Amino acid sequence: MQMTAEEKQTSAKIPAERSTCDIYIPPERKAIAGGGKPHVVARDFSIYYGEFEAVKKVNAEILSKYVTAIIGPSGCGKSTFLRAINRMNDLIPNCHTTGALMFDGEDIYGKFTDEVLLRKKIGMVFQKPNPFPKSIFDNIAYGPKLHGIKDKKKLSEIVEKSLRKAALWDEVSDRLDKNALGLSGGQQQRLCVARALAVEPEILLLDEPTSALDPKATAKIEDLIQELRGSYTIMIVTHNMQQASRVSDYTMFFYEGVLVEHAPTTQLFTRPKDSMTEDYITGRFS
């Protein structure tokens, strides 16, 4: 495939030693209508496990309807930060926070925050697919039922709509009554995405969603992220820098709990402002 003049100009800006990391740099993505407003805002936000500060005074704005990737070496705090956004860290003993983390202007850790409602608006998909040991239909209908929807026709509409959004409907429409545990790993992960979408969230958090999948299933998840881009704010933690460059509009780089750099993905991978970012993406440390 021949490079366009714009791509040649971009690649010319990458020093030879950095290009050896073989990262695909996509062209600038088009702006999203109605997107770009701060959806999640962190101000001096820290996360502690007991006295250990796992995430250190993060200041960042996550823009609505765009895809933000979070990269960094193991143990750098990226998953801890992601899980804080819908308060999954509350389940960990002695975990507490300081500073502010806001969602649509409301304090996520505020005294009167309804955690169930928060997790309805901010859905999450984990590293390992975790379908319930129920039918495919009941997996998707579980959330809507939990939030008060009982009408069977309405539930059927939600199930079909959610599975279509997750690009799974055509593969399972004739076996909705079958146990979801019988699906392949890639199908199970898309089922988990559909289950999150069924309650109509505004934000979708993906914690290394393809790390347990084969390349074919990974490609389907990446295609799904692009389909959902513009309809949801998506944040994805990944160890795969090529994946981050393929799917995201913005990238955050964490190291030892510190947000080192947060920039448009193309800029971060071709013109990083911090030498530590450059060292990481060129493979000088991992």
From Swiss-Prot:
It comes from the Bacteria. It is found in: Cell inner membrane. Keywords: ATP-binding, Cell inner membrane, Cell membrane, Membrane, Nucleotide-binding, Phosphate transport, Translocase, Transport. Its EC number is 7.3.2.1. GO terms for molecular function: ATP binding; ATP hydrolysis activity; ATPase-coupled phosphate ion transmembrane transporter activity. The keyword Nucleotide-binding applies. GO terms for cellular component: plasma membrane. Gene3D superfamilies: P-loop containing nucleotide triphosphate hydrolases. It is a peripheral membrane protein. CDD domains: ABC_PstB_phosphate_transporter. Residues 40-281 form the ABC transporter domain. ATP binds at residues 72-79. It catalyses: phosphate(out) + ATP + H2O = ADP + 2 phosphate(in) + H(+). It is an enzyme of class 7 (translocase). Belongs to the ABC transporter superfamily. Phosphate importer (TC 3.A.1.7) family. The complex is composed of two ATP-binding proteins (PstB), two transmembrane proteins (PstC and PstA) and a solute-binding protein (PstS). Part of the ABC transporter complex PstSACB involved in phosphate import. Responsible for energy coupling to the transport system. This is Phosphate import ATP-binding protein PstB. It comes from Chlorobaculum tepidum (strain ATCC 49652 / DSM 12025 / NBRC 103806 / TLS) (Chlorobium tepidum).
